[in-house]
């Protein structure tokens, strides 16, 4: 099948490629003029059909021939170009990528968990001028962002919540001074190949060193890291921890966040000292309002946090709440699989909603509001309200989740025994049978008595605070307050007003986070990487030296071969000159056979 040039151009315009044919074209001096004229046309057409060839890819030539080129089928040529160009791109990307230690100065680690470690760091001085102004903390703007949030929630309602934005702390939008770098543990395991050292080989704690009898197998990026990276890149809210950067270095993932000097767990522990009084009412109100504001933002974007607790609620030195640790967070709009299928156990046990304890397969954002209610109660009493003991999962049967009897017991002792009168779908939960078997006694609701007796009966919070707490701790998730409803609760309308700075009015400062420098494995890993790089550089230098020596030897061998060729050429020239001289004097083999030699001047001499 053949195409004319006009029809071929029409096919190009509609995106139809030329039929793939494998042909061999030979170019020589005797080639007809018509074929040589067609080559520019074919080349111009191929430029429109295919990607521009990589100049580093050599032309495909047959060995031992000159001017002969074999063509590749067009789809294969396109595939090879698109694949081979990834190599230079990755190489250029690696050259421009900067390491963690070249950008940040590590001051020590501040927290550790199953996910890995969190380090406090600051930007190096040589990077300050190269960083954009919008890459750091969002900061607190001079405008009343809280009132704007309330206007979005409270469109036509005449009663609006007034937010007190006055503060004595100087706040700006400049680049943050410190960062929190979260290093995830690699999903890997060590496989022993051979062990003949009587158990002498073992991994040293806190690093990734591998001994001679072990091989490190990487199984990929953890699900927690993928969730947190994908969600934090898209979120931008005043009360959500801001992600600054993501660094991939030597199969380790580093997430760089804005740094907060405090968290609620630290504040609660500090206030629980016998010499200190309870947390002031304005501080509690401001903290809870900001938490609800961040949760509202998450839920409006179809995100469940699923791990709200005081340790995951950060507070900046300017009194701004930042919800962090989205490792268990998940989007709940049109999920491909049920929330229970992905994670059978969510939320720390003390803050876990009763529907989760009863084994629900389908839950709603109400699980986050129950956790907020537990946090509010802990801020009021300076201790967890439902401090139960978690039943551990059987290692031999990880698919089954145990019934959390003790945790339910702690909840029932304060909120009373739930019934179908106050919880319509109670008898539809998978663990309802276990619930009826273990809880036969009817407990009354003692939340109001608990509220009056906290802090030795010295509770300065109003009844509106108790109403908010009761609305957040409803058994039935359908009757529980939503984040929007909680933000509009009358508790936030009464005095004292919600402060933009939760620490406004305090005559003391909370201590900063403690920094640990005794186990700084990020530096150890970097040192090992530098040593490996130095070793690689030394090996490369040795290889280069060997190559140079080989090149010198090859060049010397080539010189000797050239000299031998020149000597042979000289001998051949001498023989040619001598034979020409003999022919000029009439010498022939007959005279030589007869024993007569030619002498100069035509004189002959008889031998012997």
From Swiss-Prot:
Native source species: Candida albicans (strain SC5314 / ATCC MYA-2876) (Yeast)
Class in the EC hierarchy, top level: transferase
One Pfam short name: Pkinase
Residue span of region Disordered: 1-72, 523-608
GO MF terms held by the record: ATP binding; cyclin-dependent protein serine/threonine kinase activity; metal ion binding; protein serine kinase activity; protein serine/threonine kinase activity; RNA polymerase II CTD heptapeptide repeat kinase activity
Reaction(s) this enzyme catalyzes, per UniProt: L-seryl-[protein] + ATP = O-phospho-L-seryl-[protein] + ADP + H(+); L-threonyl-[protein] + ATP = O-phospho-L-threonyl-[protein] + ADP + H(+); [DNA-directed RNA polymerase] + ATP = phospho-[DNA-directed RNA polymerase] + ADP + H(+)
Name by which UniProt lists this protein: Serine/threonine-protein kinase SSN3
Keyword Transcription regulation (UniProt): yes
Cellular compartments annotated: Nucleus
Chain residues that bind ATP: 110-118, 182
EC number: 2.7.11.22, 2.7.11.23
Ranges annotated as biased composition (Basic residues): 49-59
Chain coiled-coil ranges: none
PROSITE patterns: PROTEIN_KINASE_DOM, PROTEIN_KINASE_ST
Domain Protein kinase per the UniProt entry, residue ranges: 104-492
Keywords: Activator, ATP-binding, Kinase, Magnesium, Metal-binding, Nucleotide-binding, Nucleus, Repressor, Serine/threonine-protein kinase, Transcription, Transcription regulation, Transferase
Free-text function comment from the UniProt entry: Component of the SRB8-11 complex. The SRB8-11 complex is a regulatory module of the Mediator complex which is itself involved in regulation of basal and activated RNA polymerase II-dependent transcription. The SRB8-11 complex may be involved in the transcriptional repression of a subset of genes regulated by Mediator. It may inhibit the association of the Mediator complex with RNA polymerase II to form the holoenzyme complex. The SRB8-11 complex phosphorylates the C-terminal domain (CTD) of the largest subunit of RNA polymerase II.
Similarity annotation: Belongs to the protein kinase superfamily. CMGC Ser/Thr protein kinase family. CDC2/CDKX subfamily.
Major localisation: nucleus
Binding partners and assembly: Component of the SRB8-11 complex, a regulatory module of the Mediator complex.
Active site location: 307 (proton acceptor)
């Amino acid at each position: 099948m053949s195409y004319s040039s006009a029809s071929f151009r029409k096919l190009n315009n509609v995106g139809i490629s030329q039929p793939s044919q494998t042909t061999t074209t030979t170019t020589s001096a005797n080639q007809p003029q018509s074929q040589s004229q067609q080559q520019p046309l074919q080349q111009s057409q191929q430029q429109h059909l295919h990607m521009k060839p990589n100049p580093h890819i050599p032309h495909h030539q047959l060995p031992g021939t000159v001017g002969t080129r074999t063509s590749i089928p067009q789809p294969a040529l396109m595939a090879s170009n698109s694949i081979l160009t990834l190599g230079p791109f990755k190489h250029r990307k690696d050259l421009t990528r900067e390491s963690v230690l070249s950008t940040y100065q590590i001051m020590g680690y501040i927290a550790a968990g199953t996910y890995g470690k969190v380090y406090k760091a600051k930007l190096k001085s040589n990077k300050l001028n190269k960083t954009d102004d919008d890459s750091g903390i969002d900061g607190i703007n001079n405008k009343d962002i809280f009132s704007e949030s309330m206007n979005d929630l409270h469109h036509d309602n005449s009663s609006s919540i007034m937010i007190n934005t006055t503060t004595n702390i100087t706040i700006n939008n400049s680049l943050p001074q410190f960062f929190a770098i979260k290093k995830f543990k690699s999903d890997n395991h060590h496989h022993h190949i051979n062990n003949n050292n009587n158990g002498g080989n073992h991994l040293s704690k806190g690093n990734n060193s591998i001994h001679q009898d072990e091989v490190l197998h990487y199984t990929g990026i953890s699900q927690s890291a993928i969730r947190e990276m994908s969600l934090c890149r898209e979120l931008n809210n005043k009360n959500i921890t801001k992600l600054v950067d993501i660094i991939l270095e030597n199969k380790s993932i580093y997430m760089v966040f804005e740094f907060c000097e405090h968290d609620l767990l630290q504040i609660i522990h500090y206030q629980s000292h016998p010499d200190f009084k309870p947390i002031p009412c304005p501080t509690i109100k401001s903290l809870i309002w900001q938490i609800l504001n961040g949760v509202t933002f998450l839920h409006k974007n179809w995100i469940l946090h699923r791990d709200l607790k005081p340790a995951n609620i950060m507070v900046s030195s300017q009194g701004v709440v930042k919800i962090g640790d989205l490792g268990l967070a998940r989007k709940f709009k049109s999920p491909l699989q049920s929330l229970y299928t992905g994670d059978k156990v969510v939320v720390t046990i003390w803050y876990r909603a009763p529907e989760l304890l009863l084994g629900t397969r389908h839950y709603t954002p109400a699980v986050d509001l129950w956790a907020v209610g537990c946090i509010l109660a802990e801020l009021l009493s300076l201790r967890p309200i439902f401090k139960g003991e978690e039943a551990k999962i059987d290692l031999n049967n990880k698919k089954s989740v145990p019934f959390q009897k003790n945790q339910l017991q702690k909840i029932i002792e304060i909120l009373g025994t739930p019934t179908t009168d106050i919880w319509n779908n109670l008898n539809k939960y998978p663990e309802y049978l276990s619930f009826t078997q273990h809880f036969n006694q009817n407990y009354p609701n003692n939340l109001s008595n608990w509220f009056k007796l906290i802090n030795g009966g010295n509770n300065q919070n109003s009844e509106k605070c108790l109403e908010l707490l009761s609305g957040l701790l409803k058994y039935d998730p359908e009757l529980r307050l939503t984040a929007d409803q909680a933000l509009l609760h009358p508790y936030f309308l009464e005095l004292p007003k919600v402060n933009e700075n939760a620490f406004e009015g305090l005559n003391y400062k909370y201590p900063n986070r403690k920094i640990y420098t005794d186990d700084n494995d990020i530096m150890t890993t970097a040192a090992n990487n530098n040593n490996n790089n130095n070793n690689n550089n030394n090996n490369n230098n040795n290889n280069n030296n060997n190559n140079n020596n080989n090149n010198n030897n090859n060049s010397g061998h080539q010189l000797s071969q050239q000299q031998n060729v020149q000597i042979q050429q000289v001998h051949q020239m001498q023989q040619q000159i001598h034979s020409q001289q003999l022919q000029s004097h009439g010498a022939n083999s007959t005279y030589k056979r007869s024993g007569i030699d030619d002498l100069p001047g035509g004189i002959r001499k008889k031998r012997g």
